[in-house]
Amino acid sequence: MFPVAPKPQDSNQPSDRLMTEKQQEEAEWESINVLLMMHGLKPLSLVKRTDLKDLIIFDKQSSQRMRQNLKLLVEETSRQQNMIQELIETNQQLRNELQLEHSRATNQEQRANDLEQIMESVKSKIGELEDESLNRACQQQNKIKDLQKEQRTLQVKCQHYKKKRTEQQETIASLQTEVCRLRKEEEDRIVTQNRVFAYLCKRVPHTVLDRQLLCLIDYYESKIRKIHTQRQYKEDESQSEEENDYRSLDASPTYKGLLMSLQNQLKESNSQIDALLSEKLNLQKDSETRPTQHELRLYKQQVKKLEKALKKSVKLQELISPKKAEDTEKKDEPSKYNQQQALIDQRYFQVLCSINSIIHNPRAPVIIYKQSKGGAQNFNKDLIQDCGFEHLVPIIEMWADQLTSLKDLYKSLKTLSAELVPWHNLKKQDENEGIKVEDLLFIVDTMLEEVENKEKDSNMPNFQTLQAIVSHFQKLFDVPSLNGVYPRMNEVYTRLGEMNNAVRNLQELLELDSSSSLCVLVSTVGKLCRLINEDVNEQIMQVLGPEDLQSIIYKLEEHEEFFPAFQAFTNDLLEILEIDDLDAIVPAVKKLKVLSY
């Protein structure tokens, strides 16, 4: 029976399934071919032909088994290849180890042969050494005596050099203490100098005159210190002489004369000290009474203000004199209230008149004078009719505005002075106090003086040059900020002083002239070091003898080669002969020789 023909959809489904199975099988065979090609085998080909004479057909199960078998065979071959590779590597490693063992064995045999030869040569040399040992012992005793003598001389030299070193260390310590003392004196001098200047001038020195005054103070302070030291020295001398005179009073007929001369010298020194002290006090008073530049400027401004106030007071007196006559007339009025009111009105009127006179003064500002000019023409008429003081209010308001703008002017002048004269420290203005014209005039005067000084002194560098110098100093001495310039300058100054002191001390120690250069100093120090090295080499040559260093090195190498074998041989001899001392080997061998005979 034939199966019933399926519908078109039923016929398409098995065909699609067959196609997918076929594609899957082909993909599996392709993977098998890839494995075969990786192992160097030829791939299998899937042939699509209708002629089946030259072909062998497998079913699906057999083809699947074939694929599995091929996979297993390929994996087994790869595993076997890995095992073979590992076996080859282990075999090579074992061969290398065997070669190393063979080389070690040959080295050991060679070493054993060398040791046997050494033993034979040592046995042959023992006889010679027995004969030479006695002679060498005598020679060594003589050498030991010579070396002991050389050792004594070297010890004496060593002690001498130690004494020299201790003396040099003491001198170095004394020089260090002297340097510390001088540094402390220098610091005390600077401190006292600044303290006296601050006491005299109440400020910090920053001008050329201040430096000159500091030099003058330093000069007088050094003079006073010198006189004090001389006085102390003379007092010590007088005390020592008095002691000596007390001891030898009977034998010294001129004791009273010496005492009188010393007393006279003391009086003279005391009078000199008193004169210098009085001169110092006079200078201090003179410096205290002298005004500073700032005070002079303030005095000038105060004089100008007083002149202005004097002129104003004269004008007020002229205005008040006619008013007094009016007051005398008003005294006759019967009403007391009216009299008081009149006095108050008079005072107000005087104040307004004074304000008006100030405003209409030709010395007033130009803007204010122009605005008040219309009221000034009819001033007398206004005084008679309605007093005409209505124009004062806007003028005073404008004046107040101008005064408030003084703060901005002060700030701008301050910035300008900081740019032009940054070394002048301006006082900080208190907020409670108003801005005064004197302060503005002071700032302007300082700037004008600096400009005039710059014009007079053409050699004085400008601000850019000074800034370039400061930046160059910062680059040279690694100063990051301006605040570190002065400490680094002090450090450089102290280092330079230390170097100059060291150079001066070396010149004195080496007995060189103070005008000699550093090259001469370095060359003399090099010569001195060379002489010391030559002296040390000569001493080493005296200790080692006439032989050179190369022969000594050869002897030491021969000793290092010979001594281990000889030590082993002597240890064996000591064990065989049952002896603990090397000196007993020769007598023991002689005894054995006698016993053998």
UniProtKB/Swiss-Prot annotation:
TPR repeats lie at residues 483-516. Residues 1-24 are annotated as: Disordered. It is found in: Cytoplasm, Cytoskeleton, Microtubule organizing center, Centrosome. Residues 66-179, 254-320 form a coiled coil. One of its GO terms (cellular component) is cytoplasm. GO terms for molecular function: gamma-tubulin binding. InterPro entries: CEP70, TPR_rpt. One of its GO terms (biological process) is regulation of microtubule cytoskeleton organization. Keywords: Coiled coil, Cytoplasm, Cytoskeleton, TPR repeat. Directly interacts with tubulin-gamma; this interaction determines centrosomal localization. Plays a role in the organization of both preexisting and nascent microtubules in interphase cells. During mitosis, required for the organization and orientation of the mitotic spindle. The coiled-coil domains may be important for tubulin-gamma-binding and hence for centrosomal localization. This is Centrosomal protein of 70 kDa. It comes from Macaca fascicularis.
